[in-house]
Amino acid sequence: MLKSLVVLLLTSRVIAFPTLDTDQTAALHKPQATPNSQGTHGGFFYYWWSDGQSPAAYTNLDGGSYCLRWESGGNLIGGKGWSPGTDNRTIQISGTFQGVENSYLAVYGWLETPKVEYYIVEYHGVFNPAYDAQILGTVICDGSVYDISRSTRVSSGGTKILPRYWSVRRNKRTGGTVQTGCHFDAWRSTGLSAADHGFQIVATEGYFSSGFAEMTVADTSAEE
């Protein structure tokens, strides 16, 4: 009888474990990404932004180098360059770029008056980021034909429509020299009038894609 009572007490005992509420559970499964930031490092301007939906690690390396590893899940962009930018800069790009799907390597920047965003796309995956842009023509720069086009985007605050200029290289590459003046001349011939450069970087961008990039940038304008 005593043995039966011990078994009954053991089997009827309730053990309570702490539980996570909804917010704690969401935080536990939230993708981890390097916090957004911009500034100077190693004598170069750097810019890093993600929407926080993709596991991603951005790291500034020595000089004009940076490293980015990311997994699919959202939108992100990062890289090194200069602030302010300029119409006429000779940029040397080297390193390793292993982006697939919707990812690209580009010279990326802003003009401030009025606000205009631009991309000189050196490499993209299966998805052309300028697929829905208005074709303006072509230009030959640095040994390849580039398709130049214009599109628009909504500002981050959702209050303005901003123009965006594209120059997409047909003969894709992940390194070499980019003469930005060739592209700005082409864009300005189609109506680009904005001046006063913001930053200008060699960027790795991903959108629901995955990949790895370790890139180095340099301004070789003075060597010409």
UniProtKB/Swiss-Prot annotation:
Pathway in which the depicted protein is active: Glycan degradation; xylan degradation
Signal peptide residue numbers: 1-16
Reactions accelerated catalytically: Endohydrolysis of (1->4)-beta-D-xylosidic linkages in xylans
Keyword Glycoprotein: yes
Biological process (GO), any one: xylan catabolic process
Alphabetic keyword roster: Carbohydrate metabolism, Glycoprotein, Glycosidase, Hydrolase, Polysaccharide degradation, Signal, Xylan degradation
Pfam families hit by this protein: Glyco_hydro_11
Bilayer-spanning residue ranges: none
The protein's enzyme class: hydrolase
GO molecular function, one term: endo-1,4-beta-xylanase activity
EC number: 3.2.1.8
Xref: SUPFAM superfamilies: Concanavalin A-like lectins/glucanases
Name of this protein: Ethylene-inducing xylanase 5
Encoding gene per record: EIX5
